[in-house]
């Protein structure tokens, strides 16, 4: 599928207006080409064939006519083992890896995989033939004191999905297939330990929403300035 492209028609700070010849979605990720740099942004408004994008990098050098390419994907985060041991910037770039590649002065237009390409111990929680829906756990992976549940993607529609196959307990790469699902139509979906989720799309596959029932008590320092008539002279 060809990606939708367009060109810059206006720049105001970190906001860029662009005209496109194809379909554009709100919250879609796009890139402005400035020389050798591809600057990441998000569509925040669509009006006909014109879209307003918020660019999450320095916009120095962007000019009217610069090429813009849409990714076809919504602004998302990656979820999975390795997430808790990382330090990220606002685009989920791992800062230690960025520093190794760019030094102390980070360069714009550099984007790295959020989840490290490591091996983890996977324990299956389902067996072939089990019926599953969005949010069900198919396995678990320990990361320090925390246990990750490897879940059926939250956005998977309920179409009679069942487990076709699942890996035995063992050590696998985070992006290896650990389970395969199949629905009533014969469609298959491979699951790894990692999946992406749009940051502005609510998660609705929950059984119960827990609401707070206790007041959060915090301590603070109260500094009071005493003023006297002598202080004002």
Where are the model-predicted features located?
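Conserved small/polar residues in nucleotide/adenosyl-binding loops
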Residues: 221-228
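Short aromatic-glycine-enriched beta-strand elements
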Residues: 16
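Low-complexity, intrinsically disordered short peptide segments enriched in small/polar/basic residues
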Residues: 31, 229-230
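Acidic-enriched and Gly/Ser
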Residues: 19-134, 139-215
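Acidic, proline/serine/threonine- and glycine-rich low-complexity intrinsically disordered segments
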Residues: 217-219
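Extreme N-terminal "head/tail" segments of very large remodeling/mechanoenzyme assemblies
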Residues: 3-12
């Amino acid at each position: 599928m060809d990606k939708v492209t367009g060109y810059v028609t206006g720049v105001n700070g970190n906001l860029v207006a662009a005209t496109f010849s194809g379909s554009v979605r709100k919250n879609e990720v796009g890139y402005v080409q400035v020389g050798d740099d591809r600057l990441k942004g998000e569509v925040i408004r669509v009006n006909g064939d014109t879209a307003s994008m918020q660019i999450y990098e320095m916009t120095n050098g962007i000019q009217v006519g610069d090429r813009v390419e849409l990714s076809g994907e919504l602004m998302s985060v990656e979820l999975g083992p390795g997430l808790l041991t990382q330090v990220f910037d606002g685009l989920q770039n791992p800062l230690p890896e960025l520093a190794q590649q760019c030094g102390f002065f980070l360069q714009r237009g550099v984007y790295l995989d959020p989840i490290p390409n490591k091996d983890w111990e996977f324990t299956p929680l389902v067996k072939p033939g089990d019926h599953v829906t969005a949010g069900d756990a198919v396995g678990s992976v320990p990361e320090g004191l925390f246990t990750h549940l490897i879940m059926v993607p939250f956005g998977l529609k309920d179409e009679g999905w069942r487990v076709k196959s699942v890996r035995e307990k063992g050590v696998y790469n985070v992006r290896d297939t650990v389970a395969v699902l199949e629905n009533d139509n014969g469609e298959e979906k491979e699951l790894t330990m990692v999946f992406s989720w749009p940051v502005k799309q609510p998660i609705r596959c929950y059984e119960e929403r827990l609401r707070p029932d206790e007041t959060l008590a915090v301590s603070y320092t109260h500094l009071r300035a005493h003023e006297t008539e002598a202080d004002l002279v």
